[in-house]
Amino acid sequence: MQGIETMQKEKVDFNVLCVLSQSNVHKPKEIYKFFRGLGLDFMQFIPLSEFHPDGTPMPFTITPEEYGRFMCEVFELWWPERRKVRVRFFDNLAEALAGQKPGSCTMHETCDSYVVVEYNGDIYPCDFFVDKQWKLGNLNLDSWSEISRRVRRYNFAAKKTLAHPECQVCEYQSICHGGCPKSRHGQNRKFEDLDYFCQAYKMIFAKAVGPLREEVKKLLGHAADLAPHSISPY
């Protein structure tokens, strides 16, 4: 709380990241109102999903339906103040509908938009896959030009293109591109599986795509009135 007060005092834009678990996923209104009461304008909600070796969800893991309901209610709370409050998921969705590349890699066609650098210089393609089999190199030993051209990096990026048959005929495929490989691989260790939160995404898209598409049309029609954001708090 002291950190929030300090950054607000110094007028520093920042994002609050809220992890959704069984302890809070049933309280969307309370959480949203709490953040707004603190004067927070940039929010991000991350669904927690971890599994036992046999594929069963760990106790704190939320269900797709719970995540979908949470975000749909947040959308209703956010919509009246959408011009002054930023919720990352809805920002990314609006970017996709505007034909832009979303800020979140979850909605990208491939997983090659960033890398993770560990304390010792080791580099991995994603913070969910800090694993020996995906290590790309080390900043102390390899140049970035070498690392960026590694076959392993291309192989990882291509994992997202292993679309499940349901994705190929889904009306939202052009938005989520099969979701996050972590959520596809996490339960059964198969990249070609459906994203664990697929049902949630469909619930959210069904709720938000229509209104956001109309909003995007209005904004693009008055582009001269839009103030560009020079710094992303995400």
Question: Model-derived features: where do they sit?
Answer:
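Radical SAM enzyme [4Fe-4S]-AdoMet core and its adjacent flexible, acidic
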Residues: 5-106, 110, 116, 120, ...
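Domain-scale recognition of functional cores that engage charged ligands
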Residues: 1-3
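Flexible mid-to-C-terminal extensions adjoining Fe-S/redox cofactors in radical SAM and related proteins
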Residues: 130-234
